[in-house]
Regions:
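Short amphipathic beta-strand/extended segments with alternating polar/hydrophobic composition
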Residues: 1, 20-23, 55-60
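Mixed-charge, Lys/Arg-rich low-complexity intrinsically disordered regions
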Residues: 1-10
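Short coil/loop residues immediately preceding or within conserved phosphate-binding loops
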Residues: 16, 41
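Short, solvent-exposed secondary-structure boundary/capping segments
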Residues: 28-38
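Intrinsically disordered, low-complexity, charged/polar segments
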Residues: 43-69
Length: 69
């Protein structure tokens, strides 16, 4: 699991994707959900090292990467 202390570091999600941890929000609500369907949940924001689309993962499914850059 990652925490705010890991922001800016290389991490890997449980599917094997490697990226840079941008943020961890403990009470994130997805704005794309209808207001009455939103629920607070912890979310980690990961960004591909070479650029691209950021992806969201529960912080419990992310760990520091052991792969060299």
């Amino acid at each position: 699991m990652v925490t705010a202390e890991d922001i800016g570091k290389r991490v890997e999600d449980d599917s094997g994707r490697v990226g840079i941890l941008r943020d961890v929000i403990p009470d994130y609500e997805d704005p794309s959900e209808l207001p009455w369907r939103r629920r607070k949940q912890p979310i980690a924001f990961l960004w591909p090292e070479q650029g691209g689309r950021e992806w969201l993962v529960p912080p419990g499914n992310v760990k520091p990467s052991l792969l060299s850059p």
